[in-house]
Amino acid sequence: RAVQERVLPLLRYHYDNFIAQVPGEQQSGATPATYVMVAGYANGTPFIVDIDPHGLIGRYEEVGFHAIGSGSAMAQQAGTLLAHFQMTDRDVDHGVLAAVRVLDALRVTSPSIGGPVDVYRLNPEGAVALSEEDIDRVRERVRRWAELESEALDRLPSA
């Protein structure tokens, strides 16, 4: 709620003064676009929330994944496909692996969506931006993940 009270007026000002239309706001019954997504820790407990133009808050802790923006539907679908890996039971490093894997897959399948992205590693001590070198190291681990999946699939008997 504190995030909502601080962020909503700033974003409303931004839209009122710089952007002619808030997506979804003018249409009756339309779902408004999310203004902002926030992730962090409160009293040692992780949270993921988004806030829409009407101030409504969506919570995603149980899912452990959320996306907003032009490619969000595809990113959320990719996140769903990774759900069987039980990412909410894994550490932050595994979350970074999954995020980079999803972002790279979207870049291949939908090159017109989005642009450069920043990846942050978030834990109770704070948020740290990953450098290009860090992301390259993560991509090496993602390649190994894909190799292990392929090997496991090869060992399964065919129908």
Language-model segments: what does each one mean?
Residues R1-A159:
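Long, low-complexity N-terminal extensions
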